[in-house]
């Protein structure tokens, strides 16, 4: 590496691979196999390309209004970003500046640790229980803020709302960020708690429920004072982070939310069926409220099963460097026919 003063040494986030092969089954990055609403395709077809000569809007007013109506909040409780990763990254800059350690689980979304390191935010990883669950009392006491994915990733386990409220009630002097990337697939949202807890900030994405991972749109919800701080950070980095096309297509998705409710139910039904089939093969399957399952194979190592599935062009996620789940595979939930193919492949591999 070239030797120059001031270069930063960073341990970056490691994303799932993005293979591009014909006849593959891609179940490694929790994408929505059902695709966007037909209304999104219609909006794309009707988009005026002359609009692209302009800068995007600063506040995505129309999208905020549609989301607010859909979610039962006011527009001043919303901020739109370039994916929920953008919102979460800005949250670290906006909320975690006390000098005290920010708390998050030892087994969760890997970006939290990366952002803490990148922005020089002290942090402490709180071990999940032996059952991979969050224990609320572990988050009591002095800290500089808390961030929890609920349902958690990569475990898929949901923290009941009453337990989340215990954490909020015990930490009213700091911001508690709840990452709801997967809330569409099970569990109860923390949205009803916004009115009671001004220290609550919720993040959501269009990547999972709305099948728009390639578009990059996400949003945050919180007290207007928190949103004001977030917008100040956004305007200090890139006020035009949400492009016009993304805003237009995300709006079309919100306006056809019944479509996503239907596909969400289909994913949940397929997930529960698939988890049951894996359990019948003596796999240890964690109870998931997401669009994936985390499972420990029986009679074969996770590494071997991962390799043999890949040889069949079936891509799942393996975490060899995560000690607590190095014997597990995370498998996204596709359409029923895809999952039947995956199950048949697993049965064949395990019986050979």
Swiss-Prot record:
The keyword Transferase applies. InterPro entries: Aminotransferase_I/II_large (IPR004839), HisP_aminotrans (IPR005861), HistidinolP_aminotransfase (IPR050106), PyrdxlP-dep_Trfase (IPR015424), PyrdxlP-dep_Trfase_major (IPR015421), PyrdxlP-dep_Trfase_small (IPR015422). GO terms for molecular function: histidinol-phosphate transaminase activity; pyridoxal phosphate binding. Its EC number is 2.6.1.9. Pathway: Amino-acid biosynthesis; L-histidine biosynthesis; L-histidine from 5-phospho-alpha-D-ribose 1-diphosphate: step 7/9. One of its GO terms (biological process) is L-histidine biosynthetic process. Keywords: Amino-acid biosynthesis, Aminotransferase, Histidine biosynthesis, Pyridoxal phosphate, Transferase. It is an enzyme of class 2 (transferase). Pfam families: Aminotran_1_2 (PF00155). The keyword Coiled coil does not apply. Transmembrane segments: none annotated. Its cofactor is pyridoxal 5'-phosphate. The modification N6-(pyridoxal phosphate)lysine is found at residue 208. SUPFAM superfamilies: PLP-dependent transferases. Belongs to the class-II pyridoxal-phosphate-dependent aminotransferase family. Histidinol-phosphate aminotransferase subfamily. Homodimer. This is Histidinol-phosphate aminotransferase. It comes from Streptococcus sanguinis (strain SK36). The lineage of its organism: Bacteria, Bacillati, Bacillota, Bacilli, Lactobacillales.
């Amino acid at each position: 590496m070239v030797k120059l003063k001031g270069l930063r040494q960073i341990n970056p986030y490691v994303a799932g691979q993005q293979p591009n092969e014909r006849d593959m089954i891609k179940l490694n990055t929790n994408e929505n196999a059902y695709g966007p609403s037909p209304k999104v395709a219609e909006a794309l077809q009707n988009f005026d390309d002359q609009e692209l000569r302009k800068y995007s809007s600063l506040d995505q007013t129309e999208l905020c209004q549609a989301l607010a109506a859909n979610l039962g909040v006011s527009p001043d409780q919303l901020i739109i970003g370039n994916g929920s990763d953008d919102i979460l990254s800005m949250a670290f800059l906006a909320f975690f500046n006390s000098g005290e350690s920010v708390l998050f689980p030892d087994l969760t979304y890997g970006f939290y640790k990366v952002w803490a390191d990148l922005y020089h935010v002290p942090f402490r990883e709180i071990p999940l229980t032996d059952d991979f669950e969050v224990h609320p009392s572990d988050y009591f006491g002095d800290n500089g803020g808390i961030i929890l994915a609920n349902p958690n990733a990569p475990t898929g386990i949901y923290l009941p709302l009453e337990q989340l409220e215990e954490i909020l009630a015990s930490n009213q002097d700091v911001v508690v960020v709840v990452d709801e990337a997967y809330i569409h697939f099970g569990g109860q949202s923390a949205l009803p708690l916004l009115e009671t807890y001004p220290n609550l900030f919720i993040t959501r994405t269009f990547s999972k429920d709305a099948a728009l991972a390639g578009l990059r749109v996400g949003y945050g919800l919180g007290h207007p004072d928190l949103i004001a701080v977030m917008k100040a950070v956004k305007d200090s980095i890139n006020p035009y982070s949400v492009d016009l096309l993304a805003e237009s297509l995300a709006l079309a998705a919100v306006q056809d939310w019944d479509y996503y409710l239907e596909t969400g139910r289909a994913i949940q039904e397929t997930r529960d069926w698939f988890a049951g089939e894996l359990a019948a093969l003596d796999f240890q399957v964690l109870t998931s409220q997401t669009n994936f399952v985390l499972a420990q194979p029986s009679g074969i190592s996770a590494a071997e099963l991962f390799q043999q599935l890949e040889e069949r062009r079936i891509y799942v996620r393996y975490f060899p460097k995560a000690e607590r789940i190095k014997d597990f595979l995370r498998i996204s939930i596709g359409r029923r026919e895809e999952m039947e193919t995956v199950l048949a492949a697993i049965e064949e591999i395990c019986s050979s």
